């Protein structure tokens, strides 16, 4: 649906058909490799009887005379092409259904789909379910609508909002975002090393196997692996991860398989996931030679024109696939994410180019001067005598035209590697501007934005395109090792993650709990509470077992959301996650929530803890801001110095102007009353670690007979102070004074 929204149905069908370039690559490469006699072609160039026609060097019946390897290559690529065509043919009916959905139900003509804002489409979809609560779900022909709004007759009829629609569209992507955020995927290369060679390899490069040895091999020395490289993701590896993980977790309808939320199937699911990793590793190893050959041919056809037209583009950069998954936020639609990253490219390039490269600059200036001098002489000579341009050979069979192209390319590349003379050197301000759009600032970067360490780390995320291309080629060889040796030990943690971080939402289905913005379970509001290692004692709502439900909770203890339910675990085994493991790293969920609210200002969260979190943030911002502006204090990560760098989200006065002060004040007062009333309640025994915080309110909240506990400081300043933990120094905390802004939406954080 998101693709149709951005392109229109006709454009989408045309785009998908043009994506099937495999046939052209197969046909043209076969012609070049098998159908031309290159010995006759090149030998004839130096003889008086030079061949002047193509038919003189063609080989008759070239396809049938091909070698076995070439024939096998053609068969494999042809099978892949047929697979692509079949997928395209199967997608056409769905695109037509979506076209009818937009045209007849939403009333949006195909010509307007490309320009209609996404919030307007969300509003139209919500109105359909509001005005057609029965017919919209009972019409068997409206498959596109059923996929969008659901067909669960038992679910209460409720108008779909932007959050529900985003959870449906990004149901699978949200799990991948969470897996990368929690660093559950080991993407380092591991190569098994025979025991006799371990003495010749540095011990720092050797690691032990993460899998326990088989009973029959326990007497043998433990296997060691040669491990190198950091977590690195390529398109080939990403495709394999989607197949192994998402193809395993979801059924054909795109819904989470029920067995993944049950503890009793854990062992079978872990073994099944390991087998998928191993099987795909073997499959990738078998087809690796053919994939490399295809990528080389395809890349040559694709990039030659680009680099020929603009040779300096060989030094251009882009974000790596791994960086994109680290930057992306929960429930962030692709077109919004791409727009956010696109706005950071120029500043990111300026930041990378700012760091001193005196030696490189001196060498490139000299190379540019020499290449420019040769090119100038040849160009002037060609202007004086035009015949020299095509007929004068500087070296055998190499005319002035050839060397003008060579020197021009060298000149363009060398100039691209020389920084501009008028560039202002301020890497800290530049990186702050980049963070404003990427929303990524690890803890170890705080206070070090000017350092070479941060520059090197960022350069790995914002890499040269040519290096990304070579990484893609190399990954074809290394992906089998990652799938076969690195990922199988992660299977147990991945299955546990799928089970523990999957919740059921009425009318939406099973989704990743981070994407629900469940502050009661995952909110990083009370950071001062010691870790218990017990599931359920996480977040602000997991009250102390003694008394007083308000202690340390930051005022965010909430009952069951009106729409959300959760699965019951079949087993009462202890949780495998500690308290800190329930929270997203780098406060990804909190900043995703604020970013989603800023992107969809009309959306009102249905979960009380989320609403209270937002209202208290805005209330604190209103108290702290000067007249005419908004500033609040919500920070989950460190920021740099000036320039608005940091982690978090801001909402400026233009967005807040849409929220009437009276309505906001009344709403805040209602939450204050709800909080005052809920402070007399506490959760019962949390010894059952698998009880979800969002179970039915009658099952999880009881009246406390004792006195009322300390509510703690639940203001936004109190929340920010509690965030200042985990060894974070005062100097680092001072960097929290500013936040990034996104799409014209800004909060200025001040403590």
Swiss-Prot record:
One GO term describing the cellular component: Golgi membrane
Reaction it catalyzes: a 1,2-diacyl-sn-glycero-3-phosphocholine(in) = a 1,2-diacyl-sn-glycero-3-phosphocholine(out); a 1,2-diacyl-sn-glycero-3-phospho-L-serine(in) = a 1,2-diacyl-sn-glycero-3-phospho-L-serine(out); a 1,2-diacyl-sn-glycero-3-phosphoethanolamine(in) = a 1,2-diacyl-sn-glycero-3-phosphoethanolamine(out); a 1,2-diacyl-sn-glycero-3-phospho-(1D-myo-inositol-3-phosphate)(in) = a 1,2-diacyl-sn-glycero-3-phospho-(1D-myo-inositol-3-phosphate)(out)
Region feature (Disordered): 528-584, 676-751
Top-level lineage group: Eukaryota
Ranges annotated as spanning the membrane: 22-42, 72-92, 366-386, 399-419
InterPro entries on file: Autophagy-rel_prot_9
Polar residues composition-biased segments: 563-576
Basic and acidic residues composition bias: residue spans: 708-727, 735-751
Name of this chain's protein: Autophagy-related protein 9
Annotated source species: Cryptococcus gattii (Filobasidiella gattii)
């Amino acid at each position: 649906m998101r693709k149709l929204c951005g392109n229109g149905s006709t454009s989408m069908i045309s785009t998908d058909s043009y994506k099937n370039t495999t046939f052209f690559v197969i046909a043209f490469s076969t012609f070049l490799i098998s159908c031309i006699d290159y010995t006759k072609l090149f030998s004839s160039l130096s003889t008086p009887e030079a061949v002047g026609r193509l038919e003189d060097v063609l080989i008759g019946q070239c396809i049938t005379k091909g070698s076995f390897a070439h024939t096998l290559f053609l068969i494999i690529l042809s099978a892949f092409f047929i697979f692509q065509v079949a997928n395209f043919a199967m997608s056409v009916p769905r695109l037509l259904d979506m076209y009818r959905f937009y045209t007849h139900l939403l009333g949006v003509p195909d010509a307007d789909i490309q320009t209609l804002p996404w919030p307007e489409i969300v509003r139209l979809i919500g109105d359909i379910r509001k005005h057609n609560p029965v017919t919209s779900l009972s019409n068997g022909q409206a498959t596109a609508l059923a996929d969008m709004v659901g067909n669960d007759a038992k679910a209460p009829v409720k108008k779909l909002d932007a959050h529900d629609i985003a959870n449906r569209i990004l149901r699978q992507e949200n799990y991948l975002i969470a897996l990368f955020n929690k660093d559950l995927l080991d993407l380092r290369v591991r190569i098994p090393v025979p025991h006799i060679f371990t003495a010749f390899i540095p011990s720092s490069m050797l690691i032990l196997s993460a899998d326990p040895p088989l009973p029959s091999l326990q007497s043998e020395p433990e296997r060691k692996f040669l491990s190198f490289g950091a977590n690195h993701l390529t398109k080939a590896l990403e495709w394999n991860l989607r197949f192994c993980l998402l193809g395993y977790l979801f059924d054909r309808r795109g819904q989470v398989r029920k067995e993944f939320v049950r503890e009793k199937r854990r062992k079978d699911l872990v073994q099944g996931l390991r087998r998928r990793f191993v099987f795909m590793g073997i499959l990738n190893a078998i087809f690796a030679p053919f994939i490399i050959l295809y990528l080389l041919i395809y890349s040559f056809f694709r990039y030659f024109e680009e680099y020929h037209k603009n040779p300096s583009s060989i030094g251009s950069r882009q974000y790596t696939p791994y960086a994109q998954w680290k930057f992306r936020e929960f429930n962030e639609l692709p077109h919004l994410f791409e727009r956010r990253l696109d706005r950071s490219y120029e500043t990111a390039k300026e930041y990378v180019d700012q760091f001193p490269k005196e030696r490189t600059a001196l060498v490139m200036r000299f190379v540019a001067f020499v290449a420019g001098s040769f090119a100038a002489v040849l160009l002037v000579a060609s202007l004086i005598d035009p015949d020299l341009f095509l007929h004068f050979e500087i070296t055998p069979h190499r005319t002035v035209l050839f060397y003008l192209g060579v020197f021009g390319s060298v000149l363009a590349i060398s100039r691209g590697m020389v920084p501009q003379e008028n560039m202002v050197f301020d890497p800290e301000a530049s990186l702050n501007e980049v963070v404003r759009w990427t929303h990524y600032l690890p803890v170890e970067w705080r206070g070090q934005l000017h350092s070479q360490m941060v520059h090197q780390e960022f350069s790995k995320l914002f890499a040269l395109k040519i290096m990304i291309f070579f990484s893609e080629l190399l990954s074809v060889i290394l992906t089998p090792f990652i799938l076969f040796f690195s990922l199988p030990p992660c299977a147990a943690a991945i299955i546990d993650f799928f089970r523990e971080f999957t919740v059921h939402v009425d009318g939406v289905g099973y989704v990743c709990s981070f994407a629900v913005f469940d502050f009661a379970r995952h909110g990083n509001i009370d950071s001062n509470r010691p870790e218990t290692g017990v599931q359920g004692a996480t977040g602000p709502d997991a009250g102390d077992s003694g008394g007083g439900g308000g202690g340390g909770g930051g005022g965010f203890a909430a009952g069951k959301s009106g729409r959300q339910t959760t699965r019951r675990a079949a087993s009462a085994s202890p949780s495998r996650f500690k308290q800190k493991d329930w929270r997203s790293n780098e406060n990804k969920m909190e900043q995703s929530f604020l970013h989603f609210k800023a992107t969809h200002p009309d959306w009102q969260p249905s979960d009380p803890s989320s609403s209270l979190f937002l209202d208290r943030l805005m209330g604190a911002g209103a108290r702290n801001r000067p007249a005419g502006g908004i500033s609040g204090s919500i920070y989950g990560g460190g920021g740099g110095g000036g320039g608005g760098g940091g982690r978090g989200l801001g909402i400026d006065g233009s967005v807040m102007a849409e929220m009437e002060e009276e309505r906001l004040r009344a709403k805040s007062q209602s939450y204050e009353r709800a909080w005052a009333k809920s402070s007399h309640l506490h959760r019962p025994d949390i010894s059952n670690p698998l009880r979800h915080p969002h179970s039915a309110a009658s099952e999880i909240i009881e009246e406390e007979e004792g006195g009322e506990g300390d509510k703690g400081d639940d203001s936004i300043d109190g929340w920010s102070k509690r965030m200042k933990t985990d060894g974070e120094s005062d100097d680092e905390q001072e960097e929290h004074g500013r936040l990034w802004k996104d799409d014209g939406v800004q909060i200025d954080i001040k403590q």
